[in-house]
A protein has these predicted regions:
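Membrane-integral, polyisoprenol-dependent glycosyltransferases
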Residues: 2-157
């Protein structure tokens, strides 16, 4: 061995980058599904347009059925990139994508090899249902991300 880094490390970063590009590029492939995606896109739009970031509204009616974090994040994305199907889904997609390295990190943390951790993360990344849900503007992906991040954080403390 000459002490140089293995080519696999470079390949994994290239794979990670390609996955990220594909993950985000496929967001606007189809229109928003009714009723949920439209609702979770309209509430942040109304926040963004009205400037009232405290009271979520749907068609002008106060809407307190869900926690506001996703609305705030999506409205913030609208203020930077504008309103589109892509920006409506960006928060959920980003959180879904960020779960992948958390799965890898958790697997490594509990003593799995890099190979096993990579297989676990890539299995999640190519699981059809996970990818589909991550590409929908729904609250489920934020919930999944924060539960996964909590499990990973607890593994840092207790393992």
């Amino acid at each position: 061995m000459n002490g140089s880094k293995p080519a696999l490390g470079i390949g994994l970063w290239q794979l990670w980058l390609a996955l990220g590009v594909l993950w985000l590029a496929t967001l606007p492939v189809r229109p928003l599904f009714d009723p949920d995606e439209g609702r979770y896109g309209e509430i942040p739009r109304e926040m963004w347009v009205s400037g009232d970031w405290v009271t979520p509204r749907l068609n002008g009616v106060k809407y307190f059925e869900k926690p506001p974090l996703q609305y705030w994040a999506t409205a913030s994305i609208y203020s930077v990139f504008g309103k589109s199907e892509w920006t409506s889904r960006l928060w959920s997609a980003a959180l879904g994508f960020l779960c992948i390295p958390l799965v890898y990190g958790f697997a490594r943390r509990i003593g799995q090899s890099r190979h096993v951790a990579t297989i676990g993360a890539m299995t999640l990344a190519i699981s059809p249902l996970y990818v589909i849900v991550s590409h929908l503007n729904l609250l489920d992906q934020a919930f999944t991300f924060f539960i996964t991040a909590t499990v990973f954080a607890l593994s840092l403390i207790h393992i």
